[in-house]
Design a protein with these regions (language model features):
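Catalytic donor/gating beta->alpha subdomain of glycosyltransferases that bind UDP-sugars
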Residues: 176-236
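Short beta-strand-to-loop acidic/aromatic patch adjacent to the donor-nucleotide binding site
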Residues: 92-104
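Short beta-strand/loop segment that forms part of the nucleotide-sugar
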Residues: 35-46, 68
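Membrane-embedded multi-pass helical conduit in multi-pass membrane proteins
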Residues: 238-324
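Short, well-formed alpha-helical segments that are part of the catalytic scaffolds
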Residues: 15-30
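Acceptor/aglycone-binding surface of glycosyltransferases and processive sugar-polymer synthases
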Residues: 70-72, 76-86, 104-186, 208-209, ...
Length: 327
């Protein structure tokens, strides 16, 4: 592989044991790949302090390990956004790898992403972000069912499929575009897709957690999904208005059918149609203003000066600590 400066960005919250194990896996997985990455953990306001001796051991591949400490807990996606801006402003590189600290993003798959990154450059697309498309998930059945339901709802409301997560390789020229995309504050992958930044994906199976259990539950999945929907706010609002318009047509047809049936002396069916039309009408009266408020709120937010990651993310950085090599 060609010589390059590679940064590995890893957000973490109270997951120090897994993060420490991940460093060893990174060092071993990349030992024969001519990669000497610099690792940057983003400490998302952990309530548990970094344990003594974290990353305090010799590495053969890793060039350095730093911990970017945030002033407060922001959440996984926003920690990634702060990390992206920090790397752009302070660590100019050829490629930035974004991955999670729990081990489900396997270090052994980084060379596959880098190889696709190189292939994109050879094909004349050097600015393409390369995502890992999840070919297989290992979570429990209930979570997989909820996730499948989320994917269906996401497709219906946004028109885009949920294909990728955080695990990716970002060229520096694409990073320069992402740091001015406000939506990365809510959802990294959705922001990339919505902003039309060039990207591609390759199928990669999800790994197992190194230690402990996944913190992703129904509430966390719901919040994660809502963050993605917010990125598509205008599209979601427009699709809801279309759905309401179709429902209004059905309402009119039901009323017309009820009147027609009434005059053909089938009163029981007419009464049933009237009840259905009344219930649907009440629901529509509540849905119409909600959809209109959503659409105009999103459109109005484009006029006002909003959150700009490049300008605002540095406010959340507390300090940077070098943990390897020790001073």
């Amino acid at each position: 592989m060609i010589n390059r400066r590679t940064i590995v960005l890893i957000p973490t919250f109270n997951d120090w044991e897994a993060a420490n194990l991940l460093l060893s896996d990174l060092d071993q997985a990349l030992a024969d790949r001519e990669l000497s990455p610099e690792v940057l953990f983003v400490d998302d306001g952990s309530t548990q302090p970094m344990p003594p001796g974290f990353a305090d051991r010799p590495f053969t591949t890793l060039r350095s390990v730093d911990v970017l400490q945030l002033r407060r807990n922001l959440g996984h996606q926003r920690a990634i956004a702060v990390g992206l801006v920090f790397v752009y402003q302070n660590l100019p590189c050829t490629a930035l790898v974004v991955m999670d600290a729990d081990g489900e993003d396997r270090p052994a798959d980084i060379p596959l992403l880098i190889a696709e990154f190189d292939r994109a450059g050879q094909l004349g697309n050097p600015g393409s972000i390369v995502f890992a498309a999840r070919a297989k998930r290992l979570e429990r059945l209930s979570f997989r069912a909820l996730y499948r339901l989320y994917r269906v709802i996401h497709l219906l409301l946004t028109g885009d499929q949920v294909r990728v997560g955080n695990f990716s390789v970002v060229p520096f020229e694409s990073l320069a575009k992402l740091v001015v995309v406000p939506e990365i504050w809510n959802h990294y992958a959705a922001a990339v897709i919505r902003s039309r930044v060039a990207f591609r994906s390759i199928p990669i199976a999800r790994g197992k957690r190194l230690v402990g259990k996944s913190k992703m539950n129904f509430i966390a999945l719901l919040l994660h999904g809502l963050s993605a929907f917010f990125v598509y706010g205008d599209i979601v609002g427009a699709r809801l208005l279309i759905a309401i318009a179709l429902a209004l047509i059905v309402e009119v047809l039901l009323v017309a059918a009820g009147v027609a049936v009434w005059f053909t002396t089938i009163p029981n069916v007419a009464v049933l149609a009237a009840y259905v039309a009344a219930i649907l009408g009440i629901l529509l009266l509540q849905a119409i203003p909600v959809a209109l408020i959503l659409v105009f709120t999103v459109i109005g937010s484009r006029v006002n000066a909003g959150f700009l990651p490049l300008r605002d993310c540095p406010y959340f950085v507390s300090s940077v600590q070098r943990v390897f090599p020790c001073a």
